[in-house]
């Protein structure tokens, strides 16, 4: 099944719900970047979270960028997601693998805290005009979900529950995705609604398992998890959004990037290598710029 994002409301429009499946996008990222199990999980969570955030943007070309800058061995993570469902990302140390740790419930899980270490999550929202809106929060746990919830609370003053997860079965990635539940401004003063939503979210103890169970039926997932809040899928074309791992790089953009180096640096490349090779960080596509093209970029 294709990766999909589904939008819904609950509690008579007082709560916004969005769920996403990103399994295929993560498999594409895993293949392109040669990700380990640990970094696959982190990448999948970051892609899911960024798509959930981008889903609320009013313009189709709106973009959300998540960046983790920290002292952990993952050596940084960057993910771009657009309102149109496209997503891409890269990590500083894609082959990183750490021993599993035990959760509070006694389950073995990935050691996200030590992978990311101490640092910050940067969230950049860009609608394509004016200056992008940027906000930074300290990492809470490194597993992405808590970190995004912290960002939404402190930077956007929006109480939110964020769930992200993945399922690996027989050493194969079989499911990745996420869910966000937010109380909308018109219901923000309703304490009973906030308490009811919190109660619901506290019962979700194994999101990855529930996601795997409903991976082909996100509507069913929302109706199951929030059954007492009467969730309703949004009507119209905005109800569902296809998700794809898609990069915006191109040969022309690579040449434009070379121009920024300036005449002196390009001449140095010509003298030493006669050509340039540019690799896109996001998708690993390689662009070969031959000598004749390089010479056309400078005044010799």
Curated annotation (Swiss-Prot):
Q: Where does the protein end up?
A: Cytoplasm
User: What's one GO-annotated cellular component?
Assistant: cytoplasm
- Disulphide-bonded residues: 247-249, 280-283
UniProt entry tagged with the keyword Disulfide bond: yes
What InterPro entries does UniProt report for this protein, alphabetically?
Heat_shock_Hsp33 (IPR000397), Heat_shock_Hsp33_C (IPR016154), Heat_shock_Hsp33_N (IPR016153)
Instruction: Please list the GO biological process terms of this entry.
Output: protein refolding
Q: Say which domain of life the source belongs to.
A: Bacteria
Post-translational modification note: Under oxidizing conditions two disulfide bonds are formed involving the reactive cysteines. Under reducing conditions zinc is bound to the reactive cysteines and the protein is inactive.
Asked whether the keyword Disulfide bond is assigned, the reply is yes
GO MF terms on file? protein folding chaperone; unfolded protein binding
Keywords, in A-Z order: Chaperone, Cytoplasm, Disulfide bond, Redox-active center, Zinc
Q: Which family does it belong to?
A: Belongs to the HSP33 family.
Function statement: Redox regulated molecular chaperone. Protects both thermally unfolding and oxidatively damaged proteins from irreversible aggregation. Plays an important role in the bacterial defense system toward oxidative stress.
Could you tell me what this protein is called?
A: 33 kDa chaperonin
* Gene source species: Prochlorococcus marinus (strain MIT 9211)
Q: What gene is this protein translated from?
A: hslO
């Amino acid at each position: 099944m294709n990766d999909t994002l589904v939008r819904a409301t609950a509690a008579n429009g007082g709560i916004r719900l969005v769920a996403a499946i990103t399994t295929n996008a993560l498999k594409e990222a895993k293949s392109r970047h040669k990700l380990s199990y640990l970094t696959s999980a982190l990448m999948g969570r970051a892609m899911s979270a960024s798509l959930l955030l981008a889903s609320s943007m009013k313009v189709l070309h709106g973009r959300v960028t998540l960046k983790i800058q920290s002292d952990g061995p993952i050596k940084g993570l960057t993910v771009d997601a657009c309102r149109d469902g496209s997503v891409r990302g890269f990590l500083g140390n894609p082959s990183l693998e750490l021993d599993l740790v035990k959760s509070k419930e006694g389950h073995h899980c990935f050691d996200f805290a030590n992978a990311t270490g101490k640092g910050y999550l940067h969230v950049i929202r860009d609608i394509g005009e004016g200056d992008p809106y940027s906000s930074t929060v300290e990492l809470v746990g490194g597993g992405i979900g808590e970190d995004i919830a912290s960002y939404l609370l402190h930077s956007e003053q929006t109480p939110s529950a964020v769930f992200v997860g993945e399922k690996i079965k027989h050493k194969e990635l079989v499911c990745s995705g996420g869910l966000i539940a937010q109380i909308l401004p018109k219901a923000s003063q309703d304490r009973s609604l906030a308490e009811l939503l919190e109660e619901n979210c506290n019962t979700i103890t194994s999101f990855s398992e529930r996601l795997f169970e409903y991976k082909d039926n996100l509507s069913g997932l929302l109706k199951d998890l929030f059954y007492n809040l009467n969730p309703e899928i949004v009507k119209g074309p905005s109800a569902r959004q296809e998700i794809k791992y898609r990069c915006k790089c191109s040969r022309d953009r690579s040449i434009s990037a070379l121009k920024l180096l300036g005449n002196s640096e390009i001449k140095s490349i010509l003298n030493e290598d006669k050509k340039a090779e540019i690799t896109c960080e996001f998708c690993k596509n390689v662009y070969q710029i031959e000598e004749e093209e390089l010479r056309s970029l400078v005044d010799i």
